[in-house]
């Protein structure tokens, strides 16, 4: 009986062997892989591809982000070199003039002795040309520095205002009202002092400032994150100022028509009206948040209701007149029916 030798390798093993023997034309033959060296990886493995990608990215280095303002300035400089040089010279001269007049106002050499005047003009005569040359030569550097300084300052102040407003509003709503009440008391005290005391201040200016400050404090109502937007703040501000403008127009007209019969000046009436309206709108918004945003809709609905009421009254009068025009015989026939 013959012993049949069955192969120990399966069809899958043969397929893998066939694939291993084939050479990829793009990658080339597989190099020998030393498994004893732990730092060596198969060249076509996924980890090797990832490491190669990371090394290529790190070798190229970080890409520098260009400022669009710098690009526009460079384009303008390349296209109009003469105009750009004149602008640099003009701005440099203006900066030197500002420095000169500032030093003149601070020192005031006309009140000094002859030696002081000579020292001042010699110092200015040496400093101003050096400053002009420095500003002109390093124009781009110091303009970028000044722009960056202004930007950082504005952002810092805006963040301070926002953080303060958020802290005030999130602490408790009643504290905001208490602070505003104290402010009203101070303004009202100034108003009384200017009217009956020896404080020589314009009453209209004081009360108008108080009412406008009410509009400015409305931004505390719109600081509830994430609804912090300038749109909400300015909408409340313009609505308050719009109502106050209407009050000013009405009071101006009344004082012009009835000036002889009103025992007060137009400025006092205007100031008092602005003062009352500003405080009323502030507290109304505090009690009903979003009331100022809904105010135009309420005004439109109120005007529509008023006009509709007038129309109903007119129709009622017309109906009554129509009934009065009915002949007496027709009324008797209708009553019999």
Swiss-Prot record:
Disruption phenotype: Sensitises cells to wtf4-encoded poison. One of its GO terms (biological process) is protein localization to vacuole. Keywords: Cytoplasm, Endoplasmic reticulum, Membrane, Toxin, Transmembrane, Transmembrane helix, Vacuole. It comes from the Eukaryota. Residues 1-29 have a biased composition (Basic and acidic residues). GO terms for cellular component: ascus epiplasm; cytoplasm; endoplasmic reticulum membrane; membrane; perinuclear endoplasmic reticulum; vacuolar membrane; vacuole. The chain crosses the membrane at residues 89-109, 119-139, 149-169, 176-196, 210-230, 234-254. The keyword Membrane applies. The keyword Nucleotidyltransferase does not apply. Pfam families: WTF. Belongs to the WTF family. Promotes unequal transmission of alleles from the parental zygote to progeny spores by acting as poison/antidote system where the poison and antidote proteins are produced from the same locus; the poison component is trans-acting and targets all spores within an ascus whereas the antidote component is spore-specific, leading to poisoning of all progeny that do not inherit the allele. This is Meiotic driver wtf4.
